[in-house]
């Protein structure tokens, strides 16, 4: 009978390593693609094709979800209305594009920490749109996260004002991304509650709609041709973009697996741990400077996330 706990422990290890390795490498690839300089001398340029990058990511995610449905959910019928998927996909892709675009103005630790604050918009939108009620511990955890972010973002005045505008623009993009993440979360909660939408069907349909919108966008704006020209000049980036998209899709699969077998609490702890070490790796590998007060803010944010994962779920709807 001891084989059951052993197999459960092995499965947890596989899920942990899957999430950790996929998203750790995903973070390194994202920073490599968006923040490095391409070319030499006066012909140096940066990657500025956030729409095209997310388009490739959505295509790979959709293909991966289709494969998962064929393998595990082939007998299940999805009854979710298409307009819900299309509406959700707009906030979903907007959040991803804003997040990737923000990396042109802020460093990766700032982006990761900003994206770690999802509980804030989810809670605010839950209270205002869905009239949800949360326990006091949830509000205290969110306050701790807000205080940590405020410490991280605090910059004492130095005599020069250079770069203030770009940093502010990057932070606005992160704020937009967080707001859209919150709207996506509210939409997904509605679909699960009213249509019992499965995670693989949701992943497939949202990414298909996102691919459709983005495909039209990059063709109409002409970004597609500039993106293809850029990949022709620097073919090595194609390898990084494909790996970036594959690690994203595979990482989502391990997250869903963790939620199914071990619940959202374990998944939250794993993803929170992963984000902290991603920031640490970014500081070491890409020499992103972080002051001591920013480290304090970072620790407070992850402490708030950990406490929220453990104690902030006290408000459950009664089961019938």
UniProtKB/Swiss-Prot annotation:
PANTHER family: SOLUTE CARRIER FAMILY 35 MEMBER B (PTHR10778), SOLUTE CARRIER FAMILY 35 MEMBER B1 (PTHR10778:SF10). GO terms for biological process: UDP-galactose transmembrane transport. It is found in: Endoplasmic reticulum membrane. A motif (Di-lysine motif) lies at residues 316-320. It holds the Pfam family UAA. Probable sugar transporter. This is Solute carrier family 35 member B1.
């Amino acid at each position: 009978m001891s084989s059951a706990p052993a197999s459960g422990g092995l499965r947890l290890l596989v899920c942990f390593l899957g999430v950790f390795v996929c998203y750790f490498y995903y973070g390194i690839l994202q920073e490599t693609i968006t923040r490095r300089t391409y070319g030499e001398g006066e012909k140096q340029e940066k990657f500025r094709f956030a729409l095209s990058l997310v388009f490739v990511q959505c295509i790979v995610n959709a293909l991966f979800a289709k494969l998962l449905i064929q393998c595990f959910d082939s007998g299940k019928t999805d009854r979710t209305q298409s307009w819900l998927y299309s509406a959700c996909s707009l906030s979903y892709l907007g959040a991803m594009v804003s997040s990737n675009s923000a990396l042109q103005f802020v460093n990766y630790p700032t982006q990761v920490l900003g994206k770690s604050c999802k509980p804030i918009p989810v809670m605010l939108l839950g209270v205002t749109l869905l009239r949800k009620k949360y326990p006091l511990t949830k509000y205290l955890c969110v306050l701790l996260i807000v205080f940590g972010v405020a410490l991280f973002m605090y910059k004492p005045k130095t005599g020069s004002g250079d770069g203030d505008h770009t940093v502010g623009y990057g932070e606005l993009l992160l704020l937009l991304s967080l707001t859209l993440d919150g709207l996506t979360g509210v939409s997904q909660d509605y679909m699960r509650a009213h249509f019992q939408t499965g995670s693989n069907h949701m992943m497939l349909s949202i990414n298909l709609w996102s691919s459709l919108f983005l495909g039209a966008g990059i063709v109409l704006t002409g970004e597609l041709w500039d993106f293809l020209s850029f990949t022709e000049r620097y073919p090595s980036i194609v390898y990084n973009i494909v790996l970036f998209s594959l690690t994203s899709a595979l990482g989502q699969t391990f997250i869903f697996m963790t939620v199914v077998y071990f619940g959202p609490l374990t998944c939250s702890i794993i993803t929170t741990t992963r984000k902290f070490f991603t920031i640490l790796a970014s500081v070491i590998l890409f020499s992103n400077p972080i002051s001591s007060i920013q480290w304090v803010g970072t620790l407070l944010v992850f402490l708030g996330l950990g406490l929220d994962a453990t104690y902030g779920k006290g408000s459950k709807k009664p089961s019938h």
